[in-house]
Amino acid sequence: MKILLTAINAKYIHSNLAVYSLKASSGRYRDDVEIAEYTINNYIDEILSSIYIKKPDLIAFSCYIWNIDMVLELIDLFHKVAGDVPVWVGGPEVSYDARAVLEKNPGITGVMCGEGEATFRELLACYEETFGGDLRAGNVMDFWKRLEQVQGLVFRSWDQTIVATGERPPLAMDDLPFPYEDLKAFDHKIIYYETSRGCPFSCSY
């Protein structure tokens, strides 16, 4: 199974911590996960072509205020050329009202809400354990039942109903692996690293 984590950054010098952290935490699926980073200055057809050539079995987008319009347009175009490839999204721009995002965007399979490292790994396990390497084979109903057990998801089920699996408890930061494999690959770029998450005053983010 080939999984593509996609980030559209504001500038070329930026990197997306979220996708690197998801890959680092993906466990036995790590070698199946590829990261693709673009910028909002890339032509949308250029990004679409690059993604299509990679032939992902599953694609996930990291969504922020600066890229959400571009991401949603890309998802619509991607389905026109690639068919029914599962598309998942995450990030602050979609997780605060995931149900509304799914209602407005039929091309999105589901939203990963909150801290995504464990959620993403368990999501991949649902796909791999149900379908193996071929997402066109396997017991579809069994897949949806498995998915309902993964905390931190809001998704469109087989009958088009929207299912929310509930919040995942905060992760212990000390348990998360270092997200960057090769720091030399980030020469002349800005990288980000978290030492804490959330707000001590219980702000919504």
Residue spans for each PLM region:
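A short, charged/proline- and glycine-enriched loop
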Residues: 1-2, 188
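Nucleotide-activated donor-dependent transferases that construct or modify glycoconjugates
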Residues: 2-11
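Tryptophan-centric aromatic hotspots in well-structured domains and transmembrane helices
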Residues: 12, 66, 96, 101, ...
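Short N-terminal binding/cap micro-motifs at the start of the first secondary-structure element
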Residues: 12-18
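A short local loop/turn or secondary-structure capping micro-motif enriched for an aromatic residue
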Residues: 13, 170-175
